[in-house]
Curated annotation (Swiss-Prot):
The keyword Transferase applies. It catalyses: AMP + diphosphate = 5-phospho-alpha-D-ribose 1-diphosphate + adenine. This is Adenine phosphoribosyltransferase. PROSITE patterns: PUR_PYR_PR_TRANSFER (PS00103). InterPro entries: Ade_phspho_trans, PRibTrfase_dom, PRTase-like, UPRTase/APRTase. Pfam families: Pribosyltran. It is an enzyme of class 2 (transferase). One of its GO terms (biological process) is adenine salvage.
Length: 171
């Protein structure tokens, strides 16, 4: 099955000049979603994770059921102020400013293997920050994965772990 047939491009969203790749058209078709999850499971299983870290917010849609399928735990990488209790964060640069990604302070035990999962890799800034945050708390990060990669933005170049995507767009 060609997963690209189930992903729609929406021009000028969220702002003019951006082509948004919408996974909602894939996940609402059970067969396409099953195929995507099966392929992601094969990619991620090879790294023997203890936990999957889903990147806010569409990464949760993939990482949570994938963790269940693989028999490992799931944690959330969230924007500042979205998690209850004590948190640990990592500040990172955006094109015009800064942002912060956080996890709950007790989410990861030192030495646990955590694979980062998101719906899409664009410039790689958020995923790279998530990897750094996980290492900050003592996690081992053997890999990262996404459903979609915008290869022309070269986001994988910002990652210092193996990265795999199921679908790649060159423009």
């Amino acid at each position: 099955m060609n997963l690209k047939d189930h992903i729609r491009g929406i021009p000028d969203f969220p702002k003019p000049g951006i082509l948004f790749y919408d996974i909602s058209t894939l996940i609402r078709h059970a067969d396409a979603w099953q195929v995507a999850m099966g392929r992601l499971a094969k990619v991620v299983r090879a790294h023997h994770p203890d936990l999957l870290a889903g990147v806010e917010s569409r990464g949760f849609i993939l990482a949570a059921p994938l963790a269940l399928k693989l028999g490992c735990g799931f944690i959330m990488l969230r924007k500042r102020g979205k998690l209850p209790g004590a948190t640990v964060g990592y500040d990172y640069d955006l094109e015009y400013g800064q942002d912060r990604i956080e996890i709950q302070a007790d989410a990861v035990q030192p030495g646990q293997r955590v694979v980062v999962v998101d719906d899409l890799l664009a410039t790689g800034g958020t995923m790279a920050a998530g990897i750094k945050l996980l290492r900050k708390v003592g996690a081992e990060v053997p890999a990262a994965a996404a459903l979609i990669e915008l290869a022309f933005l070269k986001g994988r170049d910002r990652l210092d772990v193996p990265f795999e995507a199921l679908v790649s767009y060159d423009q």
